């Protein structure tokens, strides 16, 4: 199984060993390495893009065996290679995912329990279970000040990896199990705006966007 270097490193470049490179029907290639800094699509987060050897990494996914597969636009020779994650897309993905955690924490302060989310650009939302007896959705303006306060606090990220299980939090906030990428402190999220709150069948969907 591919070593997930992004679990414990924010580096964007590294030397890796290409184990296989297989052509796909659409003309792209599926490349597997012994280890990678590339975060695959999953956990509600988009996969990283970048370069592997001389090839462009178009997206990164898991295969059925649990290996991380780099989908590239060209063949990559088996053996040593250099990889480079696209910095801009990684930062955006990390900001969006971190914002999702902070929205979950904001909701918890009002008695709502977050249990899933989608942190892709243009689709970003966090879904909460409604407190017992609550039938009316809050408004974005009700939560926005608390979210803004968490972001402005510049709380430092804390990551723990034990027996392959990874937990993340910022400052003294409660830790959650998460294998995705996040910014180093909450201020790096930047301006995050709650755009819509919809309550249906006991679930509150909170949509959000980054303003820059």
What are these regions (language model features)?
Residues 1-212:
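Active-/binding-site microenvironments in catalytic and ligand-binding cores
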């Amino acid at each position: 199984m591919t070593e997930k270097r992004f679990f414990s490193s924010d580096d964007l470049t590294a030397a890796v060993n290409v184990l296989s490179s297989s052509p796909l029907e659409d003309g792209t290639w599926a490349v597997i390495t012994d280890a990678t800094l590339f975060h695959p699509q999953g956990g509600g987060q988009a996969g990283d893009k970048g370069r592997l050897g001389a090839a462009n990494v178009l997206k990164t996914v898991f295969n059925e065996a649990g290996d991380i597969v780099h989908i590239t636009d060209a063949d990559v020779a088996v053996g040593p290679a250099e990889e480079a994650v696209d910095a801009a897309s990684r930062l955006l993905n990390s900001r969006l995912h971190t914002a999702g955690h902070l929205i979950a924490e904001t909701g918890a302060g009002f008695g709502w329990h977050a249990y899933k989310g989608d942190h892709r650009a243009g689709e970003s939302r966090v879904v909460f279970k409604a407190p017992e007896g609550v039938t009316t959705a809050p408004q974005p303006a009700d939560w926005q000040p608390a979210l803004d306060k968490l972001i402005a606090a510049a709380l430092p990220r804390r990551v723990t990896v034990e027996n392959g299980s990874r937990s993340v939090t910022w400052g003294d906030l409660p830790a959650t199990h998460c294998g995705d990428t996040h910014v180093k402190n909450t201020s790096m999220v930047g301006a995050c705006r709650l755009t819509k709150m919809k309550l249906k069948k006991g679930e509150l969907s909170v949509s959000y966007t980054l303003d820059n």
